[in-house]
């Protein structure tokens, strides 16, 4: 081939898609992240013909011959410049050779120091034994090509392959200049289309997102997902074919729904089951070339469109498919709005930097049709580049009647359970859709359960079961005790007469207030007997509005305000009135529509928002009342205390429950006034046997010693509580009290929308308490076949469910189909559940208690539960306030108006461990509550203690204005504190550029996603509001990470039950037994390789050394000399290293000592990216070594403790950054291992590797020296750090092992390796550099070419400077001293010396950038 005419080729600007990807490259450190790969297997083809066709296809798509080069001017982005030949892209090898690291590994290595001036595509051609082509692996950087471009190249390759079989062969090669001209034109057109879309559609999209955010729509924040991309790895795949494929096609045609939408619906259902949430953000990959021939060019033009989807947990398949289809069509209409712009709007409007999205990539053909005849099997995607979350890749093969589903996920996630079967579950959901089209979509994902009579969930074949008709009202066909109950109520029948005389007809509604006497209760009873309903108001001022509302929205009903106190009732109705009363009672009992008429209209509690009026029918109330006696055991010998406000639905249970059971009913007004002492006295004086209380009130009573004493002397036999979670500690206090234990306790649950109570759970019975872990269970249904669980949310269906809110159309209400053609009313409660170890559902908070705090989602219910677990806390309230989370708490000390700083401090630490980004803690004498037991939020926010706890707005405003000035200077345009970065047109690259100055100004390390989500200086200052109660964790410790660390702290430290071992290793003298160095290819591992080589070369005694690593050792450094050396084994491990693999290695080698050098040292990645190597593997290694009686040398680091000689580690829940947390956990795991394990934990200072390792590393010391030499200046700083080399550390550590030292063992202790103390200022001044202010140095660095050429090293230096800002004048040890620590159960702590040699020369070698050879 003739090389391109370099001098004639013009540089081509990047497309908008490529610019976005380049922004990502600048932020990410993994060269493999953007690798795209596809594998083809061919029928045998002549190599010469194949290469000729491949060369022609490359020339026809010349973007592949381009490299990225920065323009001579100070441009934002590099340009595409043709500088390569075909031979630079192609590698031919025999298929028998194989490549241990994969065919794309060499390309990844090429990109390790950056992607500028590097080939971005590699064709690896495989040949069979006969020399014919049998396979092709294509790897490219995503910035060069997308999926559509791959299809174009495939079509060209097919064309030229077909031509190569003709006598004339491929013929004239395509002209390079024409291809480059088409490429440039396509990029210009794409840029124009994007600009036009922004001009025409951006405002509409912003309004749409704002509306969705206001309605609570959109995806949940992925507290565990940083928003940064990670390498995608294939998890699993399946193929739908044969009858399953045909049935799916038939469904698509019958319902007129595209196949990709059906797949999306199935994926959404399965994902909803996995996440236990019905809110999703769906992202669809789109190829904008469609329909535009000018864009039909091989390059990267990829875009994605996103749309939010929120569906009811009981929604049918039909409903979800319909909504998803509409959302997809709407999203595709704005396909030219760039995904990164849409994301910026989404993050800014939703004030979050974390988005959990499901990506769907539906590909309508596995390859270009013309290529199929040459292929022996369908091509396979081997690498898909960066992804942010679960990605469902679906490939349609119409020719083979097959639909292939593949699940890809982030490589940095913990190892997935092999039984996850996500692809299989999606396939099963697709197969079941036709039969379940009108059933809940939860059933397709096996997420629909009915809670049975025993409280256990079970799957059902239909959404519900039709119930036999029940009584139309609670007083129709009632038990004999009802008559006696009514006869005891002296005002009931006079009230019925009054209603008759005043023209109140059946179906009307009485609106009134409570006069705190039996007279009002009797009116409510009389209303029902007369076929009417009632609605209670808090005050007389509310009567008129309530009556008007009911009149407007209750068709066929009239509302009648009544002044109860003013009505004068006769003692006994006369004969004529009695006849009219009897006629009315008979008329009502015979009314065929009685069950549908309103029994009461009651406001919701308002706990989760503005109270809404709920209409409950007589039929619903009758179904509930019929369940009270069997569920609670109430009977005619009971006396029920009516103490709840009549505006609360607890009063419904008290009044009508007593009526149907024939019990006595007595009243107390103490609850209404909040007089708990008075309530206790009434319980004693009035003699009730049963009382119904809000859980919060019961908690407070239990904390009141006087009240407990009074209640203990009463006739009480049962308390029914409900309204919020029960505290286990309070239950224990109850059963441990001799006077309270005999009183049974029943916890009830139910929303106002489903007639008072749906389930009940016995907590204390006969003085015995239910086990602690069972006390938050959902419980037993009041009525059979009414309680369901769908996607982790409680759904109530059947007669208990109301028709909905008065005058409000709410999606929580709907209907499900039992399968017999009928419909059952359904209500989605928003109450979340999990399943405990015994299979019972357990309450896990509410969906609507999740609030946004500083852009992050916080579950206030979970926070309240954690704080309530503190035994000193009597009461607590948790609510958002001015962008922060407020916690008001009450203890015995605060009740006496005393300070309780200890409790406040513990609460602050709890909030920090839960990842709450901004909060304040307020100690109060008492938590204000409403009569129904709910927290009175209005009074809470006016408590005088709040002013002292919350910082003033003036300081925050000044800080925001200062930050806006910093941005204005940097961007060259005026910005105010409330100016939107998005609205001002600040691009992604500009955001990356202002990030360093923003970090410096705020003194905090933050990500570009946090900057995007804040969008204004004012928001950002508010989001990063300080939490003085706890050490800052730099924003990395989100709720999910905190939970993961908590789990690891509890579970990984305790060794699992040993698994059965295989054959024992061959016997060895322990003093001369082999040593395994695990992770030998890393910096310290290579140090061991160098140290062992030098011992061998010096003729010193050395036991057999096994150098084991997952990656292939390089061909330079000590490795080439070690190969074939006697007593040295080099073992390459598999990609995953489990207990069985490690056990096999030990058995095979006969090792008696193991040095664990494996570890992820990247200080920039999140905890989940470190966990596998730094935590999980450490646990595995410790267990296997203990089981095999193998000594363990565990390598650790200085960053885990303020004092490296102390047997303590910083509490990983409070560590300053993820890497430190993971290393602290690792030490805790080793120290807590089996007593049989002989170990030492070796704490290392900074360790430098071989020269070739340093040249490719992003070590902070090397990076700082490199940056200083590039700038010819170093920052003024006083920093001293211990440093050693891998070789020196290895030599010192080997001396610890009995094979070298002759000692009996390692000693179950800690060994501190001491290096040389390096003063940064002294070191850097030795390079003849200028010393300048640190801020000025960092500013120069951020603007430098070095920063653009070395994004990885710049990121590390940037994080280092950010940490320095947090340290201030303190050393790192002094900084860590402010963090809580955990002691290690170890023996002695010893120190060994490992001084490095020629440190300055080594650093210079690491910084030296040899000239890159010019590319032809």
From Swiss-Prot:
It holds the Pfam family AMP-binding. GO terms for cellular component: cytosol. This is Isonitrile lipopeptide synthase. The modification O-(pantetheine 4'-phosphoryl)serine is found at residue 988. GO terms for molecular function: ATP binding; ligase activity; phosphopantetheine binding; transferase activity. Belongs to the ATP-dependent AMP-binding enzyme family. Disruption phenotype: Deletion of the gene cluster mmaABCDE causes a significant decrease in the intracellular accumulation of zinc in Sauton's medium where metal concentrations are relatively low. The lineage of its organism: Bacteria, Bacillati, Actinomycetota, Actinomycetes, Mycobacteriales. One of its GO terms (biological process) is amino acid activation for nonribosomal peptide biosynthetic process. Keywords: ATP-binding, Coiled coil, Ligase, Nucleotide-binding, Phosphopantetheine, Phosphoprotein, Transferase. It catalyses: 2 a (3R)-3-isocyanyl-fatty acyl-[ACP] + L-lysine + ATP + 2 NADPH = an isonitrile lipopeptide + 2 holo-[ACP] + AMP + diphosphate + 2 NADP(+). Contains 4 domains: a C (condensation) domain, an A (adenylation) domain, a T (thiolation) domain, and an R (reduction) domain. The T domain acts as a lyine-specific peptidyl-carrier protein, and carries a lyine residue that is transferred to it by the A domain. The C domain catalyzes the condensation of two isonitrile-containing moieties to both amino groups of the lysine bound to the T domain, a rare activity in nonribosomal peptide biosynthesis. Finally, the R domain catalyzes a four-electron thioester reduction, releasing the product from the NRPS and forming a terminal alcohol product. Residues 188-215 form a coiled coil. Residues 965-1028 form the Carrier domain. Its cofactor is pantetheine 4'-phosphate. Its EC number is 2.3.1.-, 6.2.1.-. Nonribosomal peptide synthetase (NRPS) involved in the biosynthesis of a unique class of isonitrile lipopeptides (INLPs) that seem to play a role in metal acquisition in M.marinum. Catalyzes the final step in the pathway, i.e. the condensation of a (3R)-3-isocyanyl-fatty acyl-[ACP] to both amino groups of a lysine, producing isonitrile lipopeptides. InterPro entries: AMP-bd_C_sf (IPR045851), AMP-binding_CS (IPR020845), AMP-dep_synth/lig_dom (IPR000873), ANL_N_sf (IPR042099), CAT-like_dom_sf (IPR023213), Epimerase_deHydtase (IPR001509), NAD(P)-bd_dom_sf (IPR036291). The keyword Nucleus does not apply. It comes from the Bacteria. Gene3D superfamilies: 3.30.300.30, Chloramphenicol acetyltransferase-like domain, N-terminal domain of ligase-like, NAD(P)-binding Rossmann-like Domain, Nonribosomal peptide synthetase, condensation domain.
